[in-house]
């Protein structure tokens, strides 16, 4: 396999395939972004990092000027309406603030700005036009002020998730409404009562359903056919299934998305993240606790996008130690002209980021620091923008220093330095520089500092 032969697992075909762009001069990717009503939690960040990594690889293979990446912002949604009602704030105030938070937090994780970040509310005319086309083609109908997609009118519905419509009805929680012809039919447009966001349309004042937003924005910015559509696997059904139905029925001459990619979900310490378990936290929570964005990114990249990812404190501490060691090693080094072939080979093999990280470790062991720096920077690591945190680790060693001083004081009296030596050895093994003088004890985290190993200090 050559370095430029990119292979990706296509959810639609359930196979790993050689990626052949529709137009190598204009490689196009659409990724479903956040619904902006609150801070992004750690799970929201995973697709942002995964598809940022793919964006970087596509830019490396085809050239930065030949790749277009669209990641939308959903700023019209019932969750946003509910938050506005709870807080008494305007919807625009909430969506502007939370969009800003999201972009700041994702930038802190080293994600490059997408080519386009469209807000759904800026594309209402395109949504209305697409809905009109679907009605005219016999794929949608008006009922009680709603416009609904007629799922039975699209024979290929269910192909992405591999389920028949009847199976879906049996196994899914579908919204039952008297105006639906079929339980699986979904809303394209719904009426808005006073006090809710609404736009004039042929069907009265209302707002779009969730699924039509992405179909309209991707069509407007990328065309009837484009290369890659990505998102979390929780979006595979119904969101992506519905997008395919809408887009292929509105524009049957196009192919919509050629390759579909889905990242797996995130857990915390082996359990699903939830507020009830007390293990729910946002990206900003971690950043405010002093966990560098680069460390969060490194932990994310340590698991293949197709596997469930487990965020643990141990992984966080290990990532911090590795990055601190690498940053100390490459200080003053100029990066090689390109990433190491071994790292690139892993990345073009279905975005094998854990394999690429293993190759970074090998480059470090081999002393190939220019190669390490260039390769890590391709992966969004070891850049100047992501640095600064490593010079003064966010750790308080004052209690350990006081304890060692106490043990040392006792040892001077008994002439038995066994415990002093044991503590000192454990601290050094954890990457801590131990400085003892008449003035007292000073503990300084070194480049290989690993907080996880402090547990061994007795």
Curated annotation (Swiss-Prot):
Gene3D superfamilies according to UniProt: Cysteine-tRNA ligase, C-terminal anti-codon recognition domain, HUPs
Superkingdom assignment: Bacteria
EC numbers: 6.1.1.16
Cofactor: Zn(2+)
Enzyme class, first EC level, given as a word: ligase
Primary localisation category: cytoplasm
GO BP annotations listed: cysteinyl-tRNA aminoacylation
Sequence motif: 'KMSKS' region, positions: 272-276
Cofactor stoichiometry and binding remark: Binds 1 zinc ion per subunit.
Binding site for ATP: 275
Cellular component GO terms, alphabetical: cytosol
GO molecular function: ATP binding; cysteine-tRNA ligase activity; zinc ion binding
Motif ('HIGH' region): 34-44
Xref: InterPro entries: Cys-tRNA-ligase, Cys-tRNA-synt_Ia_DALR, Cys-tRNA/MSH_ligase, Rossmann-like_a/b/a_fold, tRNA-synt_1_cat_dom, tRNAsynth_Ia_anticodon-bd
Keyword set, alphabetical order: Aminoacyl-tRNA synthetase, ATP-binding, Cytoplasm, Ligase, Metal-binding, Nucleotide-binding, Protein biosynthesis, Zinc
Record-listed Zn(2+) binding positions: 32, 214, 239, 243
Entries under PANTHER family matching the protein: CYSTEINE--TRNA LIGASE, CYTOPLASMIC, CYSTEINYL-TRNA SYNTHETASE
Binding partners and assembly: Monomer.
Annotated family: Belongs to the class-I aminoacyl-tRNA synthetase family.
Protein name: Cysteine--tRNA ligase
Source organism of this protein record: Dinoroseobacter shibae (strain DSM 16493 / NCIMB 14021 / DFL 12)
């Amino acid at each position: 396999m050559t370095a430029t032969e990119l292979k990706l697992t296509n959810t639609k075909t359930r196979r790993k395939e050689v990626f052949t762009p529709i137009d190598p001069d204009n490689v196009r990717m659409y990724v479903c972004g956040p619904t902006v009503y609150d801070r992004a939690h750690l799970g929201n960040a995973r697709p942002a990092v995964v598809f940022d990594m793919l964006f970087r690889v596509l830019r490396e293979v085809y050239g930065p000027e030949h790749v277009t990446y669209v990641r939308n912002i959903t700023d019209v949604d019932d969750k946003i309406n509910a938050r506005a009602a709870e807080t008494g704030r305007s919807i625009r105030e909430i969506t502007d603030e939370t969009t800003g938070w999201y972009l700041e937090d994702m930038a802190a994780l080293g994600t490059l700005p997408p080519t386009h970040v469209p807000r759904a509310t800026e594309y209402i005319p395109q949504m209305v036009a697409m809905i009109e086309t679907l009605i005219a083609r016999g794929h949608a109908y008006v009922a009680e002020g709603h416009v609904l997609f007629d799922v039975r009118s699209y024979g290929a519905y269910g192909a992405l998730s591999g389920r028949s419509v009847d199976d879906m009805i049996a196994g899914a929680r579908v919204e039952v409404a008297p105006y639906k012809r079929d339980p699986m039919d979904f809303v394209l447009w719904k009426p808005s009562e006073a006090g809710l966001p609404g736009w004039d349309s042929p069907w009265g004042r209302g707002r779009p359903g969730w699924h039509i937003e992405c179909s309209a924005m991707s069509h407007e910015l990328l065309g009837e056919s484009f290369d890659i559509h990505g998102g979390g696997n929780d979006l595979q059904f119904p969101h992506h299934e519905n997008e395919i139905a809408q887009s292929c029925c509105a524009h049957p001459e196009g192919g919509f998305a050629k390759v579909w990619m889905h990242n797996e979900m995130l857990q915390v310490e082996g359990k699903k993240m939830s507020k009830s378990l007390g293990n729910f936290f946002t990206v900003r929570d971690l950043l405010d606790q002093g966990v560098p964005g680069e460390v969060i990114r490194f932990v994310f990249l340590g698991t293949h996008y197709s596997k469930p990812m487990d965020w643990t404190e141990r992984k966080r501490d290990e990532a911090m130690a590795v990055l601190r060691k690498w940053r100390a090693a490459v200080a003053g080094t100029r990066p090689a002209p390109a990433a190491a072939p071994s790292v690139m080979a892993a990345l073009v093999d279905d975005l094998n980021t854990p394999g690429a990280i293993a190759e970074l470790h090998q480059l470090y062991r081999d002393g190939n620091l220019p190669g390490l720096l260039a390769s890590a920077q391709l992966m969004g690591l070891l850049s100047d923008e992501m640095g600064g945190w490593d010079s003064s680790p966010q750790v308080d060693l004052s209690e350990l220093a006081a304890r060692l001083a106490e043990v040392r004081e006792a040892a001077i009296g008994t002439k038995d330095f066994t415990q002093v030596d044991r503590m000192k050895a454990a601290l050094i093994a954890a990457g801590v520089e131990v400085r003892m003088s008449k003035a007292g004890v000073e503990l300084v985290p070194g480049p290989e500092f690993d907080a996880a190993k402090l547990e061994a200090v007795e």
